[in-house]
């Protein structure tokens, strides 16, 4: 089993010019938790997926969930039901913690 305590979760994020490079804190068939870094201007295209939670640690941007778009900033949390489309655009460098369960 991987570490269970991460003192500085933001420092785990990896930033790359070609897009997000998720860093898994845990990855099992039942559950995934990851840290993602996006550079300003990068995006995650709108796509359907399983139920998920996104908690923003750094930066500002926009997140689309279904037909709604929300401003994201440190401390914001977005919860998305299974099958609902979601995506995001980073206005500044963004770091978020994501988790999702089994489909």
Please state what every model-predicted region is.
Residues 1-34:
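A short, N-terminal "cap"/entry segment at the start of jelly-roll beta-barrel domains
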Residues 19, 32-48:
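Conserved short histidine dyad/triad with adjacent acidic residue
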Residues 29, 64-68:
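Short strand-coil-strand connectors
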Residues 37, 48-63:
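Short, conserved beta-strand element in jelly-roll/cupin
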Residues 57-58, 73-74, 92:
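A cytosolic small-molecule/anion-sensing beta-strand core signal
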Residues 67-83:
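Short acidic-glycine-tyrosine-enriched beta hairpin
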Residues 82-103:
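Ligand-binding loop in jelly-roll beta-barrel domains
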């Amino acid at each position: 089993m991987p570490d269970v305590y991460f003192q500085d979760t933001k420092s785990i994020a990896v930033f790359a010019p070609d897009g997000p490079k998720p860093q898994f804190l845990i990855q099992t068939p039942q559950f995934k938790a990851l840290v993602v870094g996006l550079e300003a201007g990068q995006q995650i295209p709108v796509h359907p997926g399983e139920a998920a939670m996104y908690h923003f640690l750094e930066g500002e941007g926009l997140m689309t969930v279904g037909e709604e778009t929300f401003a994201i900033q440190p401390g914001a949390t977005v919860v998305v039901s299974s099958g609902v489309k979601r995506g995001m655009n980073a206005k500044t460098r963004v770091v978020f913690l994501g988790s999702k369960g089994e489909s």
